Amino acid sequence: MVQRWLYSTNAKDIAVLYFMIALFSGMAGTAMSMIIRLELAAPGSQYLAGNNQLFNVLVVGHAVLMIFFLVMPALIGGFGNYMLPLMIGASDMAFPRLNNVGFWLIVPALVCLVTSTLVEAGAGTGWTVYPPLSSIQAHSGPSVDLAIFALHLTSISSLLGSINFIVTTLNMRTNGMTMHKLPLFVWAIFITAFLLLLSLPVLSAGVTMLLLDRNFNTSFFEVAGGGDPILYQHLFWFFGHPEVYILIIPGFGIISHIVSTYSKKPVFGEISMVYAMASIGLLGFLVWSHHMYIVGLDADTRAYFTSATMIIAIPTGIKIFSWLATIYGGSIRLAVPMLYAIAFLFLFTIGGMTGVALANASLDVAFHDTYYVVGHFHYVLSMGAVFSTIAGYYYWSPQILGLYYNEKLAQIQFWLIFVGANVTFMPMHFLGINGMPRRIPDYPDAFAGWNYVASVGSFIAMISLVLFIYILYDQFVNGLTNKANNKSVLYTKSPDFVESNEIFNLNTIKTSSIEFLLTSPPAVHSFNTPAVQS
């Protein structure tokens, strides 16, 4: 056991470890969000006894757990490590031991994050950790320092993983697999790795300066010493905006594969899809100040960031319409992954539309720091990144495990989370338009109605996640029975347009699903092909 799981250098085992920590963190983050929603279900103080600091500690815990310990480990560490070598015909990742270190840095990071909530009054700064609220005057204990260490460790982990993904993709493709034949999920992880590589050092620099300000009397963000807290915001958001694309681009890759498989046809405009992802990634670095319209930027600066932000809608639209064109005229099977993919298309588009509204500097003056923003980013994260994670699990887990989930239960779980998430986050837009501020545990009575609706929706979504845990249990215990009883709607193992590993160099058809041509579950080393350079 110790040899296999503690010292593991096998990408598949490390991916399983990533999934385990993602599931654990996701449950913890969901629990925190439920406490937040219970507190906000009615005006006045409900459960936190007026402890507003604790409310903000829950907010920062929920955010950091969901972003750094659920979505990134699941989509990048889990699906990335497991599927990327299979899809390019590599026997493992390029640096297997680096992979192991990358995972085991996540665990102390999680410990640091949990500890930060337990010392003094916790880090009640919001996930952005803005000074002067995060300065030593406003947060005097070591809580913020521990949160900074957690960010440092996850950053190093992600950087090591990114280097690994880039080198693997460039150097370990099988014979005949040119970059143009790379499956879309591999492209997604590849582009994501570059985004991480370029954005994380900036975050690390920013929080390191904050650490020095707090403990070693420097004045990077201290006005009295000639510093400027706005510098921190620029550094943070130069990471923070690419980060949201880091969270969603692997989801784009998963959705492409699912839509293609269940429509029985290749993705419409595959090269365009790759260029769209690359454009989104590049433009993501040029728009960071749209998070800061109200800090006193010049009018021409605001005009630039408004225009640049709206340009990102173009490659995103290319992706949405290409997915729709893939579905159009296909032989559609509405199995669970396809339901999630179609829901993703609708809900991600809604999130994108509210994003276009927020891109306008003049409108954002009204919307900034209201629940409109919360509604917007939960549509793209909760119903974009998380939906694509669950979709990817339902799509690949029968192949990964050789065990099948109960299709009927999975469909019920889909409809529950679909209804629950919408009922939770749609009212937030209405609250935001009416001016309800974020990160405040109490509110005027006028906001009571929609807040109650949102809290009911969060309860529905939580029930669906409990059902998801039961579906996992059922899959591990009764997986073979489910397969035998046809309780699972099986996809065809290899759609007509998929070509096998041996004939890459003989044809020009771009394959997208070698992983389904392997044994189920795959062997410890699925391929023994030598690494070749194109």
Swiss-Prot record:
The residues joined by the cross-link 1'-histidyl-3'-tyrosine (His-Tyr) are H241-Y245
Record-listed Cu cation binding positions = H241, H290, H291
Q: How is the cofactor bound?
A: Binds 2 heme A groups non-covalently per subunit. Binds a copper B center.
Its pathway is: Energy metabolism; oxidative phosphorylation
Query: Where is this protein localized, as stated in its record?
Result: Mitochondrion inner membrane
Any one cellular-component term (Gene Ontology): mitochondrial inner membrane
Q: Which residues cross the membrane?
A: 14-36, 57-79, 146-168, 189-211, 237-259, 266-288, 303-325, 338-360, 375-397, 414-436, 451-473
Binding annotation for Mg(2+): H368, D369
For Ca(2+), which residues are the binding ones? E39, A42, G44, P441
GO-annotated biological processes: electron transport coupled proton transport; mitochondrial electron transport, cytochrome c to oxygen
**Keyword Magnesium recorded:** yes
The protein depicted here goes by the name: Cytochrome c oxidase subunit 1
Which organism is this protein's natural source? Candida glabrata (strain ATCC 2001 / BCRC 20586 / JCM 3761 / NBRC 0622 / NRRL Y-65 / CBS 138)
